[in-house]
Amino acid sequence: DLKRVAVGPPASGTQLASERILSVAGLKDFRKLELGFNESAEYLRDGNADAAAYQTGIPYGPVVDISVVQPVDLLAIPDGVIQEIGKTYPFYVPVTIPRTTYKGMSRDVKSVAVKMLLLASAKVPDEDVYTVTKALFANLDRLKASHKMGETLTREKALEGVTIPLHPGAEKFYREAAILK
């Protein structure tokens, strides 16, 4: 039973995301706990929360710490809810959290993610943004090696979840690299 859900710190991106996702999923009958990330982990560990939402990279340290003490059971989001979330909020994209992420996980877990964006002011010269974007893609292997979720960095998914206009310098690279038609 999800009676007490830690939805993230007040006015945070995690709180906004968790409330959006829970709303689309039709979950309303629970007590919202507006807690910081470490406090949410403590509440889970101590049995004072039934679930906690995290909008963070994985693996996430406090959850790793909990999984050492007690099994972690991530809640999968059903496919239909993932599709509805994507329709309502196109910047959320499907993601699968591997079962090897936290101790005690017995299966891969379907969820949603927000892509990280590298933003530039319109005042930054096009050539500078082009050069940085090109360098990022030239070094994908190094980026992938730097974090467990690096494997999700692909040319095919480069623009997935992007709902804002591209900087002209980035657009130039994406067209040149045939990522953007």
Language model features with spans:
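Catalytic-loop motifs flanking and including active-site residues across diverse enzymes
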Residues: 14, 125-128
